[in-house]
Structure formats: structure tokens, C-alpha cells
Amino acid sequence: MVLVILVVASYLVGSIPFAYLVGRATRDIDIRDYGSGSLGTSNVWQNVGRWASFPSAAFDVFVKGSLPAYLAGIVTDNSWGIVACGIAAVVGHNWSIYVRFSGGRGIAVAFGLLIVLAWQVAVASVSVTVIGWVIFRSSAVWVGI
């Protein structure tokens, strides 16, 4: 029963549309009406500003991605519970109940989960992404690697 509550809570935390809130608070816009239309840090970067993307990224990675998985690891001693809470947070980010099931792509939230599950892999992933971006000036391909 505790795990079910944690998974539902993880979905609700993951559903917090922080990119939407940043767009509303800073420029009084619905970020979904601009750029890619997604509720994510990349769209905030492109349409609100770089300065606004950093808190958006931090919230997505640490509050939405890492925190639910970390708390699940403390409350339960079940690795599947940690993964279930992390996936619920990603699903919440991608299909947020608060904004009629629209959302982002879940990359930052999934990265937050990866930090909890295997921080060494997360560091390697960031390294490959940064190197790919420096060489090719495009992160789209490198984020997936």
C-alpha cells in the first residue's frame, strides 16, 4: 500500500508544470503556444530565456526526477519501487494532470532518476552530451546517447 501511495505521489510531483509556471511568471505566456509546444526546459530556454531555463532544469531534474526516487529508496527497500516512482514522475511530466495531460519529453526528469539509480552513468551521459554539443553545436542527438 505504501508503494502505491508513493507511485501516485510521484506522478503528482512529476505533473507539476514548472516550465509552464516559469513562462507565466516571467513573460505571462503559455509556453505551449511557442516553439516546440512542449512543457520542458528546452522550450523555456528558446522562448523565455537562458536565465529562466536553469531553475526549470533544476526543478525537473532534482525535484521531479531525483526526489521521488530517492524518497522511495528511503521508505521502501525495494529497487523496483524506486524505478516505479521514477517512471511515474516521468509519466507525470509527459502527461501532466494539471495541464490537461500535455507535458514535456521527460528527458530532465529521467536524468534525475538516473542520478539516483546510477550516478556514474549520469556523469558519463552528461560528458558525452557536452562533448557532442561542443563539437557539433547540437544536443538533440547527444542527449539520447
Where on the chain are the PLM-derived regions?
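Multi-pass membrane proteins that catalyze or facilitate reactions on polyprenyl-/lipid-phosphate substrates
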Residues: 2-6, 15, 114-119, 134, ...
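Cytosolic, membrane-interface loops and tails of multi-pass inner-membrane proteins
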Residues: 21-53, 102-103
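Nucleotide and nucleotide-moiety/phosphate-recognizing core
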Residues: 2, 6, 52-55, 59, ...
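Hydrophobic/small/kink-forming positions within alpha-helical transmembrane segments
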Residues: 12, 61-62, 114
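N-terminal signal-anchor transmembrane alpha helix
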Residues: 1-27
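C-terminal ends of transmembrane helices
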Residues: 19-22, 92-102, 129-137
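Interfacial segments of multi-pass membrane proteins
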Residues: 45-49, 72-75, 92, 107-136
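Short, non-helical or kinked segments that cap or interrupt transmembrane helices
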Residues: 29-38, 97-111, 138-144
